[in-house]
């Protein structure tokens, strides 16, 4: 029972908090800043969460809650970037592709994680989940450095 409640809290409540906090930060500091910070935090959580396996449940929950906040905080920024940077006649198609790719990546990850756990154990399997956020930080940094990024969020990038 408690494991299910903790999962709901980390994903449902943490995710909700992440969306609100992410929007607030993005409005004030810019979407690329928020996205890089959220993905960086998500990568750190992925790198260390496996080492909490079998340890203190409250510490594990706290880390997973933080991860739940971070993992969704950037989601809206991708859609916002598309709507602000894409040619107007392609926005719908690009949003559809972006959303579909997100679901495909999530589905693939969910199915590959048991194989990673079997091969490497809980402590190390989660480390693979840091790859995506690290690459995302690099991609967002490149976007932030591009002149077109000034078209994002009224110039706040």
Go through each PLM region and give its residues:
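Loop-to-transmembrane helix entry
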Residues: 1-13
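Residue-level signature of mid-helix packing/kink "hotspots" within the transmembrane helices
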Residues: 12-20, 106-107
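Helix-to-loop junctions at the C-terminal end of transmembrane segments
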Residues: 19-30, 117
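Residue-level hotspots within transmembrane alpha-helices of multi-pass secondary transporters
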Residues: 20-24, 111, 138
């Amino acid at each position: 029972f408690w494991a299910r409640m903790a999962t709901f809290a980390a994903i449902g409540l943490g995710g909700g908090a992440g969306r609100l906090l992410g929007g607030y930060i993005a409005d004030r500091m810019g979407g690329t800043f928020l996205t890089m910070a959220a993905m960086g935090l998500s990568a750190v959580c992925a790198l260390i969460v496996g080492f909490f396996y079998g340890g203190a449940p409250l510490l594990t929950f706290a880390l997973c809650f933080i991860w739940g906040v971070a993992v969704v905080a950037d989601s809206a920024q991708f859609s916002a970037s598309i709507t602000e940077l894409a040619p107007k006649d392609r926005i719908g198609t690009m949003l559809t592709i972006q959303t579909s790719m997100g679901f495909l990546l999530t589905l693939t990850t969910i199915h590959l994680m048991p194989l990673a756990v079997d091969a490497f154990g809980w402590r190390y399997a989660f480390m693979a989940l840091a790859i995506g956020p690290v690459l995302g930080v690099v991609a967002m940094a490149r976007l932030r450095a591009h002149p077109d990024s000034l078209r994002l969020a009224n110039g706040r990038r």
